[in-house]
């Protein structure tokens, strides 16, 4: 692969004089001893260097190449060759890490004086610095330390490698404060990749690009934190006229692309400026591109305008990536003349109009087509059209393809990824479909109205790792699954029957399972393996499906006790069994066996018994919804001690994909949350509509990051605890329909984010506290059914009835109280004048402002009169 890359980047292979092993000369003893000493300092868990044995010819060792002529070691290639990941990512990652070399790179290698090729990539050297002695290999022409876990500063001694042609330091944790001092000395360098090397600390680092060797043909500075205006780049005045490939993506460049940027780079074939903050017109930019550009990536910027008609003359283009900009207008049909085009990504723009056969007329080599999220883009082709291409990757989501299922897909037998979500298809899935996509790995037909009985088995899709058919009209039973599957979403369909026992043996790789909103019935399979497979001493049940992290069976008719199936799912972070017919008690093992659980949704079932206090051990629990069950007992103080609800930082390491939804009843309405970002910010405790008794524990005030608290519809008694004022993040509080008594605590006014409150139908008494956020609640119904409450916003007056009044601010005597109200009045007047004064000079502002004042004046007046009455009553009493 290295030789292919060198040829592609026009680096003469002959210039790197590595000779194949197999010659008659054996290696030099001094060099063999040096290699053995190197091996002794290296960590090699998978025994990659097992062939390196004392007394044997080192020229025949793995990764070692000697010169046929001299016997000197000239090449050392110890890169981790396990770099191809298939369907089981977790298993592959374990194998990949197991094959990594680590430890110390000892200076014994200096004995190999004739080394001209060194590759240590894809290993892990534990963030150690790159050894300075590497700069002593005077004959080195090829150095690859990418993805090797190095850290710290790049040693300037690398500047001594004056014969170096290829240098790759990418994707480590490196930084370079003074790369200006050593890079220009590499006068023969043709290939330089310093991607993800932090260059932000380099003094005048952007202008230092002018000092790069003129010999460079490939320059990759991807994600180097250069952070500058693009106009400050000196590339247009530099001597990098031989550049063939240039990537400056993810560098926080901003502003327009200057006219002369690419003036001298007439040989440029690849240009990557993706994920910056560039502005400008796409048509003007394309005028400046070199005539033989082959790969252009301007994605994730702020480019505007329409694609130019002259695009059809860029006949060398192989890959065009313009996604996630603000492009508009029509896609020119001349794009169909780009005969070399292999990849086209125009997704996430504002493109519109019709896509026809003409747009693809001569695209015989096209393999990647991404047009998603251009909501006004419609594809209209003849039903009998057979495309000239064989696509592998297709994403047309949120384009208009319907109402009929696109028949041209029938010819695309090489498809690996097929995404046609939300495309307006209202049709029956064709008979030929499953045969055509037999090689698919990722299938998404969600958010359409596609109908058909699901096949009894999907095992023939042996390569598939994700299938998403949610929100369609599929019916039939749950099909048998393939062993490779990681994500299955059949939610919002009409799937019937039971969850088959066969799933237990066919979900070994499954991580996300969503069968919610269907018509499933019966009990979930327990999926226990033989008793020999788990250890009774520790109770560690080994269950098939232990990789599951997200499971939703909500809105079905499933029954039975809490499924024992989940007992071994130690990575589970999202579990939704709500709106079913599950019964029995909640198992205490939830708190121990599911340590990663962040969302537990069991609403609207028939669970009974106590709420196990072991749930408090779930450190990452953000949402607990046990509403509408038959749970009884008290709310134990230890139960309201969820770590993730007490501190801002306890979010855990979980991911919920966008297509997984979560229903939360908050602010008096049921809200459905979809995206991972919103779900991860939600914190909710809902125990409503059960049979809970006793007091609300004072410890509940420690849940400082809780946003939604609903304890309504129980039989709770006692006071509302004063500590409730500690819920400073609370937005919704519902304590209605209980048997709470006593006064409403004035600390409730501390909840400055509170936007929904319901205390109705309790036995609360006394004055409704005012101040801060509570003054915004002017709907008397939130206090309805508490006959002994008085004060705004209800009509019952608190003054003159002989009742002992309690209110938020209490003082020793009337003089202090009078001073307080006098001070408050003066502050109010001064503050009001500071606001109103400027308004007197701006007529439109003053009109709007005083109209607002008129609306609230009555409320302020009533508030002041009421407090004055309280003052007089208190003075008389004393």
Where on the chain are the PLM-derived regions?
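Plant-biased, solvent-exposed loop and capping regions
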Residues: 1-878
């Amino acid at each position: 692969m290295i030789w292919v890359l060198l040829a592609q980047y026009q680096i003469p292979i002959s210039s790197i004089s590595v000779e194949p092993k197999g010659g008659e000369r054996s290696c030099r003893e001094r060099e063999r001893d040096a290699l053995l000493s190197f091996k002794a300092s290296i960590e090699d868990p998978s025994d990659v260097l097992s062939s390196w044995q004392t007394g044997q010819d080192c020229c025949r060792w793995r990764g070692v190449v000697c010169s046929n002529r001299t016997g000197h070691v000239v090449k050392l290639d110890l890169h981790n060759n396990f770099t191809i990941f298939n369907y089981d990512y977790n298993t592959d990652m374990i194998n990949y890490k197991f094959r990594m070399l680590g430890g110390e790179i000892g200076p014994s290698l200096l004995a190999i004086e004739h080394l001209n090729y060194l590759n240590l990539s894809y290993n892990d050297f534990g963030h150690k610095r790159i050894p300075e002695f590497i700069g002593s290999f005077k004959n080195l022409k090829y150095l690859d330390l990418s993805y090797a876990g190095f850290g710290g500063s790049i040693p300037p001694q690398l500047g001594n490698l004056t014969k170096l042609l290829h240098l790759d330091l990418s994707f480590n944790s490196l930084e370079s404060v003074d790369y200006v001092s050593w890079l220009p000395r590499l006068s023969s360098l043709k290939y330089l990749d310093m991607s993800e090397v932090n260059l932000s600390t380099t003094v005048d680092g952007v202008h230092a690009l002018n000092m790069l060797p003129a010999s460079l043909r490939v320059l990759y500075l991807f994600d180097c934190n250069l952070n500058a205006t693009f106009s400050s780049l000196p590339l247009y005045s530099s001597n990098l006229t031989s550049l063939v490939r240039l990537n400056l993506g993810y560098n926080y460049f901003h502003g327009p692309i200057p006219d002369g940027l690419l003036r001298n780079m007439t040989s440029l074939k690849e240009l990557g400026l993706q994920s910056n903050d560039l502005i400008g017109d796409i048509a003007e930019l394309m005028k400046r591109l070199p005539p033989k550009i082959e790969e252009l990536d301007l994605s994730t910027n702020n480019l505007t305008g329409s694609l130019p008609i002259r695009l059809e003359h860029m006949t060398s283009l192989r890959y065009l990536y313009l996604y996630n900009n603000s492009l508009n207008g029509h896609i020119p049909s001349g794009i169909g003349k780009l005969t070399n085009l292999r990849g086209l990504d125009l997704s996430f723009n504002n493109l519109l109009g019709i896509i026809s056969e003409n747009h693809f007329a001569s695209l015989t080599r096209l393999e990647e087509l991404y047009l998603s999220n251009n909501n006004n883009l419609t594809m209209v082709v003849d039903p009998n059209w057979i495309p000239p291409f064989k696509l592998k990757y297709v994403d047309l989501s949120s384009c208009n393809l319907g109402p009929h299922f696109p028949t041209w897909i029938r010819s695309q037998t090489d498809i690996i990824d097929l995404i046609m979500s939300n495309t307006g298809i209202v049709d029956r899935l064709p008979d030929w479909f499953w045969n055509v996509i037999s090689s698919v790995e990722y299938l998404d037909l969600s958010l359409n109205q596609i109908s058909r009985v699901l096949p009894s088995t999907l095992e023939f899709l042996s390569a598939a790792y994700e299938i998403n058919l949610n929100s369609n009209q599929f019916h039939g039973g749950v099909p048998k699954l393939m062993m490779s599957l990681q994500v299955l979403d059949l939610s919002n369909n009409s799937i019937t029957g039971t969850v088959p026992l066969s799933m237990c043996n066919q979900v070994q790789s499954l991580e996300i399972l969503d069968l919610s909103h269907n018509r499933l019935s019966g009990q979930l399979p327990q999926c226990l393996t033989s008793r020999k497979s788990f250890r009774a001493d520790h109770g560690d049940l080994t269950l098939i499906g232990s990789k599951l992290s997200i499971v939703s069976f909500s809105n079905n008719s499933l029954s039975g006790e809490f499924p024992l199936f989940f007992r071994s799912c130690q990575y589970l972070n999202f579990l939704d069994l709500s709106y079913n017919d599950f019964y029995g008690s909640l198992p205490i093992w939830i708190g121990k066996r599911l340590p990663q659980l962040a969302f537990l949704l069991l609403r609207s079932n028939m669970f009974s018994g106590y709420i196990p206090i072991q749930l408090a051990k779930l450190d990452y629990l953000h949402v607990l919804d046990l509403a509408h069950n038959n749970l009884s007992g008290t709310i134990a103080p230890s139960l309201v001690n969820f770590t993730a609800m007490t501190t801002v930082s306890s979010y855990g390491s979980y991911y919920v994909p966008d297509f997984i939804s979560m229903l939360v009843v908050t602010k008096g309405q049921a809200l459905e949350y979809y995206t991972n970002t919103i779900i991860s910010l939600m914190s909710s405790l809902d125990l409503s509509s059960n049979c809970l008794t006793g007091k609300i524990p004072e410890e509940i005030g420690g849940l400082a990051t809780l946003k939604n608290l609903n304890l309504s519809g129980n039989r709770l008694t006692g006071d509302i605890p004063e500590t409730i004022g500690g819920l400073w993040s609370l937005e919704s509080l519902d304590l209605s329909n209980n048997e709470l008594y006593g006064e409403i605590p004035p600390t409730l006014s501390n909840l400055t984010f509170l936007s929904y409150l319901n205390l109705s139908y309790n036995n609360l008494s006394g004055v409704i506290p005012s101040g801060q956020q509570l003054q915004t609640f002017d709907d008397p119904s939130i206090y309805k059914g508490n006959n002994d409450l008085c004060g705004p916003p209800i009509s019952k007056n608190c003054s003159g009835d002989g009742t002992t009044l309690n209110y938020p601010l209490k003082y020793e005597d009337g003089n202090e109280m009078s001073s307080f109200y006098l001070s408050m009045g003066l502050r109010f007047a001064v503050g009001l004048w500071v606001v109103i004064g400027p308004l007197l000079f701006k007529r439109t502002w003053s009109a709007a402002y005083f109209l607002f004042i008129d609306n609230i004046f009555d409320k302020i007046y009533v508030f002041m009169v009421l407090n004055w009455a309280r003052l007089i009553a208190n003075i008389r009493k004393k």
